[in-house]
Design a protein with these regions (language model features):
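Metal-dependent polysaccharide deacetylase catalytic core of the NodB/CE4 family, i.e.
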Residues: 186, 190, 210-211, 229-321
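Conserved, mostly hydrophobic/aromatic
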Residues: 183, 285, 314, 330, ...
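Terminal accessory/targeting
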Residues: 1-263, 353-356, 362-406
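Catalytic domains of cell-wall/extracellular-matrix polysaccharide-remodeling enzymes
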Residues: 14-33, 289-366
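Active-site lining segments that contact anionic ligands and/or coordinate catalytic metals
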Residues: 279, 346, 368-370
Length: 406
């Protein structure tokens, strides 16, 4: 099967996050930030300093390299271990056009340290956060990476590797890893109105008549392609580990997803036991309205009680994400690992890296106590209009191209 082939390919040589439902057939301008915090923002932009950038990136590199590393500043340069230096580029004092013009060969005028901060912190997205799509998400087309045509380039990883080579360092952990995840939008094949709506999505949105036909054919058999047990069996067969994100409640009708976790408590508990039997993780698929409703902690507690396990992993439904608010919500709710940060309509490196990292808190000038595991490839992303003309084999090839870059 395509999914099984893809999983093995990922595990062979990939460090990053990959998501497929298993329940679908893969392949199935001016800065105008809208709010201020006294003393932290100027002209609607984060008030940054060279010291902020230096400290954050020094901590980041310490997590990656086995050898000690120290960054100091002197005469307009970042100096690493008194061995190599990079000119300081104060990107926070530049306008959009300057940033776009000054970025060449994966850096802003040769400043590797500032460039790594720019991408890891999501600075461009943070300062353009008023731009939203119909679901309140920042569009990939408005990202700096998309405007420069580098969304499929792991800029941070490229620069870190250059630094490692120049210093002659080694990585603490250089073994390939795949973070395989499943968003459990549904517990089984939809029926009734939900079934017909899914056919409409297949035909009108995904432009995939064959997928709709297969869905109809499956509805007349006992073979349920939406069964979570199918995913569990796949992990059991291949000896792989998966993370399963369960929804905490039914979603609004226009979002068509979710289920009553109390009503399906026994079924979910049985699922949870099976997932644990293959060393899988159980996480939360955040309510689509989590940015509007102050209930994530309650949702986590509900799932934790049902599955009798601590819920520390999460991802947002529809990849709903607001860089000015989401990390705060995750941190306060007790989420330790999030894997939301990808664009719904494009594969690639939203934060410039395939590796886990701690996001930056612009308000308090510190790292969040949350690890972001970048979502690099999601099945639905390859159903977007950007890839509409690609056939199945070409979509697999697109994923292989991404893998070869990390």
């Amino acid at each position: 099967m395509v999914m099984e082939e893809l999983e093995r390919m990922l595990l062979k040589h990939y460090s990053g996050s990959f998501s497929y439902r298993g329940l679908r057939y893969l392949l199935p301008v001016y800065h105008t930030h809208l709010w201020k915090v006294k003393g932290k923002f100027m002209n609607n932009n984060p008030l940054l300093s060279v010291a902020d950038v230096r400290s954050y990136i020094e901590n980041y590199l310490k997590q990656l390299f086995a050898e000690p590393i120290a960054i100091v500043t002197n005469n307009g340069k970042y100096l690493l271990n008194n061995a190599i230096s990079f000119p300081i580029y104060d990107f926070w004092n530049k306008d959009d056009q300057e940033l776009l013009n000054d970025f060449e060969n994966y850096s802003f005028r040769g400043d590797y340290i500032g460039t790594i901060f720019f991408f890891l912190s999501g600075y461009w997205e943070y300062t353009h956060n008023n731009i939203k799509d119909e679901y309140g998400r920042f569009p990939s087309t408005e990202s700096f990476s998309c405007k420069k045509g580098i969304l499929e380039e792991p800029v941070v990883d490229i620069l870190v590797e250059r630094i490692r080579e120049e210093l002659g360092f080694t990585y603490k952990d250089n073994k390939p890893k795949a973070f395989i995840t499943h968003d459990i939008d549904h517990l089984w094949l939809p029926t009734g109105l939900g079934f017909w709506r899914s056919l409409g999505v297949d035909i009108l949105k995904r432009k995939d008549v064959k997928l709709a036909y297969d869905r109809i054919k499956k509805s007349f058999t006992k073979d349920n392609p939406w069964s979570v047990y199918n995913l569990i069996e796949m992990h059991k067969k291949d000896g792989t580990k998966g993370t399963f994100f369960f929804m905490p409640r039914k979603q609004p009708k226009v979002r068509w997803a979710g289920y009553d976790v109390i009503e399906n408590k026994e079924y979910l508990q049985n699922l949870g036991n099976e997932i644990k039997s293959v060393n899988g993780r159980i996480g939360i698929h955040y309510d689509i309205d989590y940015l509007k409703e102050n209930r994530m902690k309650d949702d986590i507690d509900r799932l934790s009680s049902i599955f009798d396990t601590k819920i520390e992993y999460g991802r947002a439904h529809y990849l709903v994400f607001d860089i000015t608010r989401s990390f705060d919500i995750y941190e306060k709710a007790g989420i330790k690992f999030d894997s939301t940060c990808s664009f719904s309509d494009a594969v690639g490196f939203r934060f410039g890296t395939s590796k886990p990292f701690r996001p930056y808190n612009f308000v308090e000038n510190r790292e969040y106590n949350v690890v972001e595991i970048p979502l690099i490839v999601m099945d639905d992303s390859l159903q977007s209009s950007r890839y509409v003309n690609l056939i199945l084999d070409e979509k697999l090839e697109k994923i292989k191209q991404i893998i070869d870059k990390v």
